[in-house]
Amino acid sequence: MKLTISHHKCAIRKVMAEFVGVALLVIFGAGTACQVVLSTNPSSFLSINFGWAIGIATGAWVSAGISGGHINPAITIAMATYRGFPWREVPGYIFAQALGGFVGAALVYANYFHAIDIFEGGHIRTQATASLFATFALPYMTQASCFFSEFLATAVLFIVFLALNDKHNGALTNGLLPFALFILFIGLGASLGMQTGYAVNPARDFGPRLFLAMAGYGKAVFNYRRQYWIWAPIIAPILGAQAGGLLYDTSIYNGDDSPIKWR
């Protein structure tokens, strides 16, 4: 009985760590975006990059030692594919991550509610402020370009994530992992972030997008560009992480826990 209770407590701690980690990610990221855009002294896109980078670092600090610090469904699924993460735990992780994104967005929205009203010119809600929470591509981007941008960025993310955790390749301790992820996200934002907002994380986009739909932005956030929310910030990151894992394991990884055994 004690063993069963202990097992359940461990499982709960893991999903709660993922929930809190994603909530922090969105609080820092979306909160910075709100402050940059809604302020009377707007700052630069680099400031938003720093906000999301700080969010990923703090989220990883909270969760890495407990849940592995995935805080991203694409990472969770790819870790199950390539590193033996239990598939039975994947649904719970993804639910907690999406809920964390929802709650994080709700808290930021509550904090900036009046500033959003002033910016929008009343109690109306448009994509101009929806984009502070969820991702929307620049107008010139084609559907294929949007997909590729998210696919590429997430592939890079997972390659580096695997390297940071690779004991055969100078793996970092959990204490240093957040700092490395901070640097990684600064780089991703600076190099690949402009055109789609570099979601690279289905929970960071879907959770806030669901909140927006319930907070007055309506179904437009889901109808945008023929259900952009499915194929760019969800499907592309999931497939991008799979591609990144395949590349890393076929070219660099030397461990025994990969499903790719031909080397």
Curated annotation (Swiss-Prot):
UniProt protein name: Aquaporin Lacbi1:247946
Pfam family, one: MIP
Catalytic reaction list: H2O(in) = H2O(out)
Top-level lineage group: Eukaryota
Subcellular location: Membrane
Transmembrane intervals: 19-39, 46-66, 90-110, 144-164, 170-190, 228-248
GO cellular component terms listed in the entry, alphabetical order: plasma membrane
Functional summary from the UniProt entry: Water channel required to facilitate the transport of water across membranes. Shows low but significant water conductivity, but no glycerol nor ammonium transport activities.
Domain comment, as recorded: Aquaporins contain two tandem repeats each containing three membrane-spanning domains and a pore-forming loop with the signature motif Asn-Pro-Ala (NPA).
InterPro entries documented for this protein: Aquaporin-like, MIP, MIP/Aquaporin, MIP_CS
Alphabetic keyword roster: Membrane, Repeat, Transmembrane, Transmembrane helix, Transport
Induction note: Expression is highest at 15 degrees Celsius and decreases at any other temperature.
Signal sequence region: none
Motif NPA 1, chain ranges: 72-74
Membrane topology term: Multi-pass membrane protein
Motif segment (NPA 2): 201-203
Organism this protein belongs to: Laccaria bicolor (strain S238N-H82 / ATCC MYA-4686)
Extracellular side stretches: 40-45, 111-143, 191-227
